[in-house]
Amino acid sequence: MLQNLGIEEVEGRLSDFGNLIPGLNAGKFDLITAGMAITPDRCENTAFGEPEIQYGEGLIVTSGNPKDLHSYADIANNPDSKVAVMSGATEIDFLLREGVDDKQIVRVPDIPASFSAVASGRADATTGTEMTIKMALESSNPDELEFVNDFIQPEIEGNPSFGAAAFRIDNKELRDAYNEELAKLKKEGKIAELIEPSGFSAEMNVVDPDLTTASICSGENY
């Protein structure tokens, strides 16, 4: 999409997840392409593009799942258990809504740190976007960890999370141009074609074309 906008060179910048929006607004980069979940709170500090993908949550535990964790409710009901989560991730809010005590949450800067927390015993589980953490686990392949295949999705008002690119509020011109290119891909049905090689599916992850970022930011679809 950026090439279609005449942008030939893109320089990537690494950042802790919790520093993405602060870094964006500080001018360290021009857009966030991490599939960040659109939330009403984040909408106050950043200009999201239209939704690109929808997804559920996933859980990774110590091999053998010794604490028998299959849901956020299981973590809440086992007060001795701890869960590692990236700082600033929406999963923290989901966990709290499901009854997990804040003291049970180990905040970490990124996915490798969350895996390390579980492998070292500082946490019993880690959670994040289902396909993201599953793919990360498959690529790192640590014997100490396993993906919970029968994880029960949290009941967060019946809505999945919706991810999108994020732009500075004062750079809506780039956001609007990006949205135009995104709309073309949606109309041509190419989103599934682009995401399926990464393990996503049209059935589970392609967004309803009528869904808008405005409706998520307002809370209507959040």
Could you describe each region identified by the protein language model?
Residues 1-8, 89-109, 115, 137-142:
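Ligand-binding cleft/hinge of the Venus flytrap
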Residues 1-35, 44:
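Extracytoplasmic small-molecule ligand-binding "clamshell" domains
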Residues 7-9, 26-34, 80-82, 119-132, ...:
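Alpha-to-beta junction loops
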Residues 8, 90-103, 145-146, 177-222:
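Ligand-binding clefts/hinges and TM-proximal coupling segments of bilobed small-molecule sensing domains
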Residues 10-22, 70, 106-120:
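Short helix-initiation/N-cap motifs at beta->coil->alpha
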Residues 35-44, 93-97, 124-159:
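A ligand-binding cleft/hinge motif common to bilobed small-molecule-binding domains
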Residues 50, 63-82:
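Flexible hinge/capping segments at coil-to-helix
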Residues 53-58, 141-179, 202-222:
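Periplasmic-binding protein-like
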